[in-house]
UniProtKB/Swiss-Prot annotation:
The modification N-acetylmethionine is found at M1. V-ATPase is a heteromultimeric enzyme composed of a peripheral catalytic V1 complex (components A to H) attached to an integral membrane V0 proton pore complex (components: a, c, c', c'', d, e, f and VOA1). The keyword Amino-acid biosynthesis does not apply. The chain crosses the membrane at residues 451-469, 472-488, 503-532, 581-600, 619-639, 683-702, 780-804, 829-867. This is V-type proton ATPase subunit a, Golgi isoform.
């Protein structure tokens, strides 16, 4: 199909209406999603999301999406175990890749409601089984971990008791029993508890070992009598065993020591294997605590619980308990292995179906979300939206073919509607122009049929960047980086990209042109890594004889063929010359950029057939701009082209000339050309006349036309309002006639009945005050912007100067020092060269290419968004976003 380019202006759009029977509503909607040409308008804006027709279906697929997400989490959770069972290589030895989600969504055939219901039932059953097996597996692992932990605690504590049998003895001692009764009756006040906890967490206090009492271990310096006393006094019924995190052992010991006033024996043993706690493995210690009295025993248990420790009961028959635990562990391990194998088998089946389920769920949700925008009727739904005019025939033919496959009992009505509603803006782009169009769209979407600022941006954006970045070496590095992205765009396009890299990859063609233009401007500036190139013969000749320390002057012998003469580099007045050149070049570039941008406003006015804007805005604005800044630009070129040395005259200063043109009209300090005073007065008067012209003509003309009955034309747009468009619609209607199941309504017959519902109506009553205020703001803004925007282009000179000076400083600090060694052949000098070169290259790429490049790019954005686009860009449109399954992936 021969499509309209739609680059200079947006594509022609047509408003259409579809009446779709309920029996085929899903199938037709799927077809529209695959065609990606129909921008659906919301006909139910007055309804909330819960009042729309397909809210129950959306809720259902929200639940299905949750199930698919859970299944995906379970598959990823057990990916390491199931990976070895998944087929990764086909019969030919090629890797089997996972199906791409975008391809699945675009290529999957529409499913019937019966198939969708079967798939949803299958997802529900799989989710239920996977959830049950996964929860059972986690529960079994937790129980197995508890048994292993319990066995380790019993083993370690029993071994300790066997080594110290007297500690667990049950000998009686009247004094100890009386002490136990006293402790049981002991009660602590809130102040005592606060003081005890404060002491417990004060690690500067004396430790149990410092006090000479029983701490973590039985101290070596204890006497036999003391140890015997302990063995007789501490009872087995006041023993607590358990486990706790290794990081909390010392905290537990100190808290209990302070809280029980030293009335305990505490011993801990490390557990070698990490144990599962929640979803992570942690290192733990088992402990054994001896105390006396039920009250202290309860306090110990509460402290252990507060620190998330586990208490394990230990009786005298530890060997029997260990045997019982071993049998339980073996039985539980067999059950766990069986459950795990069953789950992995289930996940293998789910793994193959997950991409299809996910694609189906996303697509069904997207379809029902779109169906909620349709207007419901008794036997069908009405859909309205915008279609590119060049796609109408394609849309009709596709609907015709599809309806024929379904049978003649179904009919879809296709109406082309006249409307004054503002159509969406649609610029056809490719992978090269897309990034440049995105630069413009980021600032604002062009109004329908407005000049596309993105077309000129393809050239002006990289060129403005290159003027500021102008270095052949740095530009070549940037060009190579972008070229690498371009040559490997298929590889990088398929991989997952982070946000930073995605921006660079998306703008790879912008970076490519930025680098190429920078190489060109680097040749113009004769600058490569802050050094000059002797490509051609210099136009200056230095004297052959001179004395050391003497200032010498070069004689001009010709004109350098291309760019700046390398003889200027390194001279005392080289910076003065380059500053003057780049400053004037910035003014010329700004004048050219703003002038052609302002010309676009004339094309916009002409396209809208708005004579009042051409006469009242464009002409006075153009005269005002050219009278001042056009004259300044001409004076710069004239001053450059005139041989002032031959005329034996000093070159006049243009800054003073421009200032005197306003402050002292007719006064000339240094004459630039004959008749200069009279011409400047005429230009100044022309600029002054343009101000009231710009201010008053449009409001007064609109007021006069309104009084005479010539105003009141609606601001809206008619999509088939011109002859060519009507002929095209007639041709499309004729081509669509004669097939069953598709009805093309007459355009004129539906225009009157539909126009009110979709159109914007006519313009309101004329308000001279509003128009006048708007024009006053426009006049002040335009006049001030002409001055400020011209000065803003001096950033081209400023950034170019900063870039050149920074590059020169970096060279002098690194490479220049590397080759200034006295012993150039020594190993130290060689190492110095290698190190300083690496340092220079890294700093060049990081600072001069990345950082300075980013700065220059942002300034180039500013020059386009503000200085250039403000001259013509309205930006009151909205983007054309067709109903497309590609939007699901994006």
């Amino acid at each position: 199909m021969n499509q309209e380019e739609a680059i200079f202006r947006s594509a022609d759009m047509t408003y259409v209406q579809l009446y779709i029977p309920l029996e085929v509503i899903r199938e037709v909607t799927f077809l529209l999603g695959k065609m990606s040409v129909f921008m659906v308008m919301d006909l139910n804006k007055d309804l909330t999301a819960f009042q729309r027709g397909y809210v129950n279906q959306l809720r259902r697929f929200d639940e299905v999406e949750r199930m698919v997400g859970f299944l995906n989490e379970v598959v990823e959770k057990h990916a390491a175990e199931t990976w070895k069972y998944i087929l990764h290589i086909d019969d030919e030895g090629n890797d089997i890749a996972q199906p791409d989600m975008a391809d699945l969504i675009n290529t999957m055939e529409p499913l019937s409601l019966e198939n969708v219901n079967d798939m949803v039932k299958e997802i529900t059953d799989c989710e239920s089984r996977a959830r049950q097996l996964d929860e059972s597996l986690d529960s079994l692992r937790s129980k197995l971990n508890d048994l292993l932990e319990q066995r380790q605690v019993i083993f370690e504590c029993s071994k300790f008791i066997e080594v110290n049998p007297g500690i667990a003895g049950r000998a009686t001692n009247p004094e100890i029993e009386q002490e136990e009764r006293d402790v049981d009756e002991f009660r602590m006040t809130p102040d005592d508890i606060s003081e005890t906890l404060s002491d417990a967490f004060s690690f500067d206090d004396e430790t149990p070992q410092d006090r000479g009492a029983l701490g973590n271990d039985l101290t070596r310096n204890q006497s036999v009598e003391d140890l015997s006393f302990l063995e007789q006094g501490y009872q087995h019924r006041y023993m607590i065993t358990g486990s706790i995190r290794r990081t909390k052992v010392d905290i537990l010991n100190r808290i209990l020591w302070r809280l029980l006033r030293g009335n305990l024996i505490f011993q801990n043993f490390p557990i070698e294997e990490p144990l599962l706690e929640g979803k992570e493995k942690v290192e733990k210690d088992c402990f054994i605590i001896f105390t006396h009295g039920e009250t202290l025993l309860k306090k110990v248990k509460r402290v252990i619980d507060s620190l998330n420790g586990k208490i394990v009961s230990l009786n005298t028959r530890s060997s029997e308990l260990v045997d019982t635990l071993n049998r339980q562990i073996d039985d539980l391990q067999r059950i766990l292995d069986t459950t795990e194998q069953t789950l992995h088998t289930e996940l293998l089946v789910i793994h193959d179906q997950l991409p299809v389920w996910s694609a189906m769920t996303k697509r069904e949700k997207y379809v029902y979300t779109t169906l909620n925008k349709f207007q419901q009727e008794s036997q069908g739904l009405i859909a309205e939206g915008w279609v590119p005019s060049t796609e109408l025939i394609h849309l009709q033919d596709s609907l015709k073919d599809y309806i024929e496959t379904l049978g003649s009992e179904y009919s879809t009505v296709f109406n082309v509607i006249l409307t004054n509603k503002l159509p969406p803006t649609y610029h056809r782009t490719n992978k090269f122009t897309q990034a440049f169009q995105s630069i413009v769209d980021a600032y604002g979407i062009a109004t329908y049929k407005e000049i596309n600022a993105g077309l000129a941006t393809v050239v002006t954006f990289p060129f403005m960047f290159a003027i500021m970045f102008g270095d052949m070496g740095h530009g070549f590095i940037l060009f190579l980086m972008a070229l690498f992205l371009v040559l490997n765009e298929r590889k990088f396009g398929a991989m997952h990209r982070d946000e930073i890299f995605d921006m660079a990859f998306t703008g790879r063609y912008v970076l490519l042109l930025m680098g190429a233009f920078s190489v060109y401007t680097g040749l113009l500036y004769n600058d490569i890594f802050s050094k000059s190139m002797t490509i051609f013969k210099s136009g200056w000749q230095w004297p052959s004889t001179f004395r050391k320390g003497e200032s010498i002057e070069a004689k001009k012998t010709g004109v350098y063929p291309f760019g700046l003469d390398f003889a200027w580099h390194g001279t005392d007045n080289g910076l003065l010359f380059s500053n003057s050149y780049k400053m004037k070049l910035s003014i010329l570039m700004g004048y050219a950029h703003m002038t052609y941008s302002f010309m676009f406003s004339y094309i916009n006015y002409r396209a809208k057939n708005s004579k009042v804007d051409i006469i009242g805005n464009f002409i006075p604005g153009l005269v005002f701009m050219q009278s001042i800044f056009g004259y300044l630009s001409w004076a710069i070129v004239y001053k450059w082209s005139k041989d002032w040395i031959k005329d034996d005259k000093p070159a006049p200063g243009l800054l003073n000339m421009l200032i005197n043109m306003f402050l002292a009209p007719g006064t000339i300090d240094d004459q630039l050309y004959s008749g200069q005073a009279k011409l400047q007065v005429v230009l100044l008067l022309a600029a002054l006349v343009c101000v009231p012209w710009l201010l008053l003509y449009k409001p007064l003309t609109l007021r006069r036309l309104n009084k005479n009955g010539g105003g009141g034309r609606p601001h809206g747009y008619q999509s088939v309002g011109n002859i060519e468009h009507e002929e095209q619609i007639a041709q499309q209607r004729h081509s669509a006639e004669g097939f069953q199941g598709m009805i093309i309504s007459d355009v004129a017959s539906v225009a009157d009945s539909i126009n009110e519902s979709v159109g914007g109506g006519e313009q309101g009553p004329f308000n001279f005050g509003d128009v006048m205020i708007h024009q006053v703001i426009h006049t002040i803004e335009f006049c001030l912007n002409c001055i400020s925007h011209t000065a803003s282009y001096l950033r081209l000179w400023a950034l170019s100067l900063a870039h050149a000076q920074l590059s020169s400083v970096l060279w002098d600090m690194t490479i220049s020092n590397a080759f200034s060694s006295k012993n150039s052949g020594s190993p130290l000098a060689v190492m110095k060269v290698v190190f300083l070169f690496a340092m220079w290259f890294v700093l060049t790429v990081c600072i001069l290419v990345f950082m300075e490049g980013t700065s220059a790019m942002l300034h180039a954005l500013r020059l386009h968004w503000v200085e250039a686009m403000s001259k013509f860009f309205e930006g009151e449109g909205y983007a054309y976003e067709p109903f497309s399954f590609r939007a699901i992936i994006e």
